[in-house]
């Protein structure tokens, strides 16, 4: 799958293009097609680190990727290396900007957890630090 990403003041756009084998969900019921989505928020600015923009894309489409994921914007080497250590079903194969400094944790940053409400994410939340923010990514299911 290839993801085209554009960040503007107040808006981020994602254009997802499937490769052969992409689009199926492990549940066998849900499918993904080529789609464009956007997020509007006044806090969004064009200075969002590329690694953050790409991890958002990864979280949106993770279950639907068959072999590889690439992005239209370069990412840090640390992002690709770290993500590929965690991924087992597919790998990230994209342009690496060796001059791009990996995103640092802000001084008052808090850990986040992609939270589904299921057993695994509930267990993960139990062992995370108390200041962890559980983030639920709403994926409306078709009937």
Task: Give the residues covered by each predicted segment.
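ATP-dependent adenylation/nucleotidyltransferase module used to activate substrates
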Residues: 4-143
């Amino acid at each position: 799958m290839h993801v085209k990403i554009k960040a503007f003041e107040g808006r981020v756009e994602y254009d997802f293009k499937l490769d052969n084998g992409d689009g199926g969900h492990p549940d066998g019921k849900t499918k993904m097609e080529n789609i464009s989505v956007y997020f509007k928020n006044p806090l969004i600015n064009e200075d969002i680190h590329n690694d953050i923009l790409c991890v958002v894309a990864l979280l949106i489409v993770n279950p639907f990727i068959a072999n590889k994921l690439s992005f239209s914007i370069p990412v840090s080497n640390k992002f690709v290396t770290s993500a590929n250590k965690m991924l087992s079903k597919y790998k990230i194969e994209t342009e690496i900007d060796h001059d791009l400094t990996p995103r640092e944790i802000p001084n008052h940053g808090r850990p986040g957890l992609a939270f589904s409400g299921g057993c695994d994410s509930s267990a993960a939340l139990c062992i995370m630090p108390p200041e962890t923010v559980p983030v639920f990514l709403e994926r409306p299911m078709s009937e």
